[in-house]
């Protein structure tokens, strides 16, 4: 791509915002020009605003340290400086919806990491390898908003990114009837590090607010279809989920139990995973993993500590496939929750939108 788009990050000081900042450094298509956050941070340099809260393992990029943080609520000012924004704010859902819609109506496309608009009927919730065609709803959304350029597109919840990609090629070939999923989710998913979450040390917390509902409902929108001016959710598979917070820094793991309309052999499942390529790979998007789904033959893999950075944290790792006594099969999955599951997935979605001309 010859053009480089000017990009802003709204919610730049939080953990996901910090991940956006690191991912956008030296991005071939996107140039980070604007950082915005709450009024508390506005008027400070990015280094001052973040202070001791920098949570990335790599140092803060020199290019952003002296950049002035702007007030995210001054929508027209921020929107005028960029071609589109990434949004990763920590606010009540109704306020997030209002803020994202305000940016869209200011003719500034929004690529959101937030959950507030995931079930807005004409807002595409996209994993580029799975349902890239859902971005075709954007003209209908623009009509509702009364915009020419502005729109909202969102990524799905981080918990889904470990198991939905593994189920997707199996859905297409064999028809998934039902699935039971138990997720074991890293503390960075709560925006925490170990020094800021002492209660997780030597502990497992068997509840994450709202996470089980998202884990059961959101896949059905991903597997849905466009009908007129809205997206119709798929009716199956039936998914039941239990979500745990575990003492892991990064990387969400899932135990998956699945039954099929037409039960495949183990070899057919492994072949479906090995051969799967989505639009992100076909378009050769900059952040796309070459091999989306990686299967490990070792009995003790995948592990977050060993495998979360596979393909720069953008791959999904699978292992321990075997037949089950109640379901047809069971297996384990893992993905990096702040890369594939959050900022990295949003950057990949933005690359898809750019490649398809939605920012022009």
What are these regions (language model features)?
Residues 188-360:
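Charged docking surfaces used in two-component/phosphorelay signaling
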